[in-house]
UniProtKB/Swiss-Prot annotation:
Entry annotated with the keyword Chloroplast: no
Gene: tpiA
Subcellular locations according to the entry: Cytoplasm
Subunit field text: Homodimer.
Entry similarity comment: Belongs to the triosephosphate isomerase family.
Catalytic center residues: H95 (electrophile), E167 (proton acceptor)
Enzyme type, top EC level: isomerase
Protein name in UniProt: Triosephosphate isomerase
Binding, substrate: N9, W10, K11, G173, S212, G233, G234
Amino acid sequence: MRHPLVMGNWKLNGSRHMVNELVANLRTELAGVSGCAVAIAPPEMYLDLAKRAAEGSHIHLGAQNVDVNLSGAFTGETSAEMLKDIGAQYIIIGHSERRTYHKESDELIAKKFAVLKEQGLTPVLCIGETEAENEAGKTEEVCARQIDAVLKTQGAAVFEGVVIAYEPVWAIGTGKSATPAQAQAVHKFIRDHIAKADAKIAEQVIIQYGGSVNAGNAAELFTQPDIDGALVGGASLKADAFAVIVKAAEAAKKA
C-alpha cells in the first residue's frame, strides 16, 4: 500500500521570521499526524534554517530545484551533493514554472532526475499539460512524453521510490482545479503508462496532484484511488490550511 505524501512548495516566498513561525505552527498543527508523510521545500537560502526549525519532527526537507552538475564553474547553481549535505530529501524537478520561465527541456529534466537518483535523493518529477494542450485533447500525449524522457533513457527501475506530481499548468495558481474524476483519469493513465514497462514499479510510485489544491477540495481529491497526495503551492504558506490538506490525505488513505 502506498503511503501518501503532501509536500509544500513555498516557491519564492519567505523570510527568516516567516520560516521560523511557519515551521513552528506546522509542528503544532501536524503533531498527531502519522498516516501521511509531509515535506516542505523552502527557498534554498532558508533550507538550513527550516531544517533546524523542524528538527525532531516528522517534517521532511525538500528543495525546489537542482543543477545537473556536481561542482565547477556554474555560477548560481546548487548541486545534488549540496542538497544532500544540508539534509534535503525530496527535490522538485520539471515544475512548469521552470519549464516556462527557464526553458527547461524534457531532456534536461531527465538529467536532473538521474543526478538525484545517483545521490540517493527522491525526485519529485512534475508533469502536466498547458490549457491549450488540454483543450486540444493532448493531456495524455504530453504526460507520456514527459515521463518517457526518463523512462526510455533510464528504464523503469529508476522510478522505484520516486514521486510524480501531476500539475495541469492551467490549474497552477489560477484557482482552477481539475475535478477529482479528471485528476484520477490522468493519474491512472500515468500509472498505466509506467506499468507497460514494469507493473510492480508502477504500483508503488507515489503520484501527487498539484494545481490549486486547497482545504476545500483536498478531501474529495484524495478519495480517488490513484491520487497519493499533493504538491501544494499557495496553501502551504499557511500552517492551518496546509494541515487540513495533510489530514485529509491521512483520513482518505486510512479509509
